[in-house]
């Protein structure tokens, strides 16, 4: 058994790794980051760019608005904007410094149909980006794999920029992941261990990250409610039933996504590599904490509970799949709401199982305006799951994917998302890119 200090350090490390800031949807931002790094390596604006991506990257970049772009969409826009005006040192906030001059130059370059070529790469990890940029007879290559800022290849004219071979760079990145996994292996994550940490643990090392999540994600939610972004899902909900805490919880989460999916330049704290999931983990919990008049310390611990449960569930699915990640985040939010309301550990677990038994398996068909509606639906299911659990009700083991314990249910749903939905993911992409004609 790990000591409390080992457990606390491991979970604080998870929170600090997860809760990084990103400006806009993380997939186009990752493309922009790779392009900015390639341009920086060349030392000038590229003469030509090739961007090769996995299907999931193409799916998630196709329809979402690239932040600070003036309303542009797509991989070409993200890559060229990153190359022209991005600051690679800012990582997932790479486009924060883009100005009107940059946007005008990007429009000029995109008018040349041959300036930036995009291709689909098969047989690679779900999160894969390779940018090849050329200028003045030189070629810079940046490859990102598995995580949005995980650079596994960075070369100039075939010579590794990091001072190691491309294979060594990739091996180094893999070794860091393996070391992190080993560091946390003695502290297995489960609903029980997460609650132990939240109720009794020393959270100080992760407090600043969660405080920033509450501040940033609260700000983009307020922006989404104050102004017309996207399909205005949050404003629609708030206009219909503002006197209902459950509806307000859905509205605040959806509003953050309304703004983020449609080009709002405000940064967010991400969870599981996703700003939408970072928003979904935090906003419903913030609304219920305010409604219940909880003190700030209890709010911080509740948001941590939400984040960690989302990470725990998502770990069974992996980065980017056909399984909508907002479901994982909503499970976390629902569990945190149950905790705020004084629910037992059994009721917290039942909230998660009830939510997965309801909306587990909603498909991801790319980042776009309707993500806000999926977040609303997921949070609605989580609140129903919470209400059922608090009244001693729930779905029985053996019904669908519901198992004897919440951990077994999480594992079964994760298997479906990771393995069972692989073909679903392919068919969704084929329809989106026009490869499959259904009528």
Regions inferred by a protein language model and the residue ranges of each:
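Glycine/charged-rich beta-loop-alpha catalytic/anionic-binding loops adjacent to active sites
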Residues: 11-20, 57-66, 259-270, 310-320, ...
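Membrane-embedded translocation segments of transport machinery
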Residues: 243, 247, 260-293
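Signature of multi-pass transmembrane helix bundles
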Residues: 111-263, 429-439
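Acidic-glycine-rich active-site phosphate/pyrophosphate-binding loop
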Residues: 2-13, 45-57, 244-263, 295-313, ...
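Conserved phosphate/anionic-ligand binding catalytic regions in large, soluble enzymes, centered on
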Residues: 21-37, 266-283, 324-328
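Early transmembrane hairpin of solute transport permeases
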Residues: 32-129, 133
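Functionally critical mobile loop/hinge segments
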Residues: 7-17, 25, 89-133, 196, ...
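Hydrophobic alpha-helical bundle architecture
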Residues: 39, 67, 288-301, 311-377, ...
């Amino acid at each position: 058994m790990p000591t409390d200090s080992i457990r606390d350090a491991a979970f604080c490390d998870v929170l600090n790794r997860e809760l990084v800031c990103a400006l806009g949807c993380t997939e186009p931002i990752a493309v922009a980051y790779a392009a900015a790094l390639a341009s920086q390596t060349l030392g000038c604006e590229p003469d030509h760019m090739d961007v090769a991506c996995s299907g999931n990257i193409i799916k998630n970049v196709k329809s979402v608005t690239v932040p600070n772009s003036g309303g542009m969409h797509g991989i070409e826009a993200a890559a060229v904007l990153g190359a022209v005006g991005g600051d690679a040192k800012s990582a997932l906030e790479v486009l924060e410094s883009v100005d009107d001059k940059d946007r005008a130059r990007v429009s000029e370059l995109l008018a040349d149909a041959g300036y930036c070529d995009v291709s689909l790469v098969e047989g690679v990890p779900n999160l894969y980006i390779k940018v090849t940029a050329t200028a003045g007879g030189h070629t810079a290559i940046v490859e990102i794999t598995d995580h949005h800022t995980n650079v596994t290849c960075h070369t100039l004219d075939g010579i590794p920029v990091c001072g190691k071979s491309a294979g060594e760079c990739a091996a180094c990145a893999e070794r860091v992941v393996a070391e992190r996994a080993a560091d946390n292996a003695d502290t297995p994550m489960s609903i029980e261990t997460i609650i132990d940490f939240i109720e009794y643990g020393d959270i100080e090392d992760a407090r600043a990250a969660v405080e920033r999540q509450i501040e940033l994600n609260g700000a983009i939610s307020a922006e989404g409610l104050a102004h017309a972004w996207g399909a205005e899902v949050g404003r629609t909900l708030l206009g219909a039933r503002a006197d209902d805490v459950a509806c307000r919880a859905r509205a605040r989460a959806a509003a953050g996504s309304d703004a983020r999916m449609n080009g709002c330049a405000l940064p967010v704290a991400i969870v599981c590599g996703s700003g939408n999931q970072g928003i979904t983990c935090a906003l419903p919990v913030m609304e219920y904490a305010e409604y219940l008049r909880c003190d700030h310390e209890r709010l911080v611990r509740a948001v941590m509970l939400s984040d960690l449960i989302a990470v725990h569930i998502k770990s069974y699915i992996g980065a980017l799949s056909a399984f909508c990640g907002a479901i994982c985040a909503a499970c976390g939010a629902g569990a945190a709401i149950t905790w705020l309301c004084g629910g037992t550990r059994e009721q917290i677990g039942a909230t998660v199982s009830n939510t997965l038994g309801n909306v587990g398996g909603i498909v991801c068909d790319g980042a776009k305006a309707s993500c806000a509606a999926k977040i609303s639906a997921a949070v609605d299911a989580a609140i129903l799951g919470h209400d059922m659990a608090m009244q001693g009700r729930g779905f029985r083991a053996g019904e669908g994917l519901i198992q004897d314990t919440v951990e077994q249910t999480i594992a079964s749903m994760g298997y479906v998302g990771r393995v069972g939905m692989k073909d679903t993911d392919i068919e969704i992409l084929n329809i989106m890119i026009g490869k499959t004609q259904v009528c």
